[in-house]
Amino acid sequence: MRLIPLRNTAEVGKWAARHIVNRINAFKPTAERPFILGLPTGGTPMEAYKHLIAMHKAGEVSFKHVVTFNMDEYVGLPKEHPESYYTFMHTNFFDHVDIPAENINLLNGNAADIDAECRRYEEKIKSYGKIHLFMGGVGVDGHIAFNEPASSLASRTRIKTLTQETRIANSRFFGGDANLVPKYALTVGVGTLLDAEEVMILVTGHGKAQALQAAVEGSINHMWTISCLQLHAKAIMVCDEPSTMELKVKTVKYFRELEAENVKDL
């Protein structure tokens, strides 16, 4: 596992965006051989999306031959709802870059047959072979996507019940009322994420410090689903200074020295 210790949220977003652009450009995608990118929603990746849009407008990257798969979607929320992840992605990213509409894959939380929708999504991912890079965030309780504590580490795309803690955390997008946050969501599984060639998790804020500590220094534990990334051959944690507060000083020092050449010019 790599840990990229940076100073603040802005640097986390910039580093993550630069890493994605480097990966896409090194891959040299074509229509017949697209780059497959997994994407999250929420507050944490906002800076990364801003930088990706800026780099696209500067001519540094094209998303014409990029295929995306989003991590999750609320169940029962109309896709036109301002807080649906469909709306979030189009407002904050897709509408500002050159990605073709047919290359965008989002879970349908209003599907008549939820189980069939989850199977369809898994099969669509498999049809491309694998996701080359999956960017994500982490919850206060260590959840990745909507894989809440006690999720199976072998799980696939499915419906999940959201914990009260997650609904309270997401209530900031619903006028502060947790009762307006849907109780269920469709989410890629832990196993789905582990199948990706590379997984990059963005961690910002003191509130995520315990989750980061569990991911990096703790044991693999289904109560901290983020810890599953210790099993991944190519996992990266990109974090700001407040989120490292629960890590041992020597852990942060070790990774800071190890990644010194990779955090220049931020």
From Swiss-Prot:
PROSITE patterns: GLC_GALNAC_ISOMERASE. The record marks 151, 158, 160-161, 254 as: Part of the allosteric site. GO terms for biological process: carbohydrate metabolic process; glucosamine catabolic process; N-acetylglucosamine catabolic process; N-acetylneuraminate catabolic process. Allosterically activated by N-acetylglucosamine 6-phosphate (GlcNAc6P). GO terms for cellular component: cytoplasm. Its EC number is 3.5.99.6. It is an enzyme of class 3 (hydrolase). Keywords: Allosteric enzyme, Carbohydrate metabolism, Hydrolase. The active site is at 72 (proton acceptor), 141 (for ring-opening step), 143 (proton acceptor), 148 (for ring-opening step). It catalyses: alpha-D-glucosamine 6-phosphate + H2O = beta-D-fructose 6-phosphate + NH4(+). One of its GO terms (molecular function) is glucosamine-6-phosphate deaminase activity. Pathway: Amino-sugar metabolism; N-acetylneuraminate degradation; D-fructose 6-phosphate from N-acetylneuraminate: step 5/5. Pfam families: Glucosamine_iso (PF01182). Catalyzes the reversible isomerization-deamination of glucosamine 6-phosphate (GlcN6P) to form fructose 6-phosphate (Fru6P) and ammonium ion. Homohexamer. Belongs to the glucosamine/galactosamine-6-phosphate isomerase family. NagB subfamily. This is Glucosamine-6-phosphate deaminase. The gene is nagB.
